[in-house]
Each structure stands twice: as structure tokens, then as C-alpha cells.
Amino acid sequence: LRDSNGDFYFLEVNPRVQVEHTVTEMITGTDLVSLGIRVASGEEIRLKQNDININGHAIQVRLNAENPVTLAPSPGKLWECHWPGGPGVRIDTHAYTGYDMPSSFDSLLAKLIVWAPSRDESIAKLKAALSETKLLGVDTLIPLHQAILSEDDFRKRNITIHYLEEHKNLL
């Protein structure tokens, strides 16, 4: 950050891989976590920007243990836990049947990422993957994600950071 006097201020460093790195991995076929571990262990990576090609479209949703209307945390035990699968479907999770979702920590249960050649195909694949996902025992954001994926403004890419405020009637 640079102020009106020309002085610079340091805001933050994220010495970690961002949660969204999975989208980059899906469209490039590059394992960023593996590369990070190799760099941290002193290995020289000979990968160049020109070696990385973008292919297709990926979408990630966070499957949080939250009420889909109020977004309030939903702690509890997962009585049933079934994750989707198939080509172009990735699930990154720590949750399992019997997992106790605590009330005092991050509500993330899993990241669901899909890849397909086009955005429309990715949306269709994500809708199918969400309908295949079964998480019983806590509320989740699955109904909200399903509503967003079917909503016209989202499908037409007419979205801003105010999307949820502007679409309070999704659920």
C-alpha cells in the first residue's frame, strides 16, 4: 500500500498456498503443492511460464457446515458422508462419517472442484457432483450452491461481490 505521501506500508504475506489453488491445478495440470514442497526442500524447479498451458474451465465451491440461509455455523456429527467422484471431479477434505464438526473453528468440511472443457459443462458437472454429495448431521451450503448454479445472473456471468445481497431470494 502506498499513501498520498508516497510512503509504502506492508499489508500481509501469505506464506501458504491459497485455498483456490485447486482451480489453477485443474486447468493447468500442475501440482502446486508438490512444487512448493520441492522448492522448500531445496530442489531447483526448471518449470517455465511457457511450459504451463491453460485448458478448460474449473469451478470450486466450499462445502461449509453452515446454514445456507443465515450462514451461521452448523456444528455437529456427520452421520453420513458420501463424496462425489468421476473424471474431472476433485474433493479435498478431512471430513468422514462420524466426524464431529466443532463450533469454534473454521466451518470448511471440503472443497469440491470440477473441471470440464467449457464453463457450461463445468456448471453441469458441479450440479451433478453436488447432488451426489451426501452430508447428513450438519447443515451445509450445498442448497445455496445449487441455487446459485441455476440462477440466471450467475449463468450469464452478471455477478459482483454484492451477488448474495442482490439475490436474497435464492433460498
Task: Place the predicted regions along the sequence by residue.
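ATP-dependent carboxylate activation and anion-phosphoryl transfer catalytic cores
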Residues: 1-171
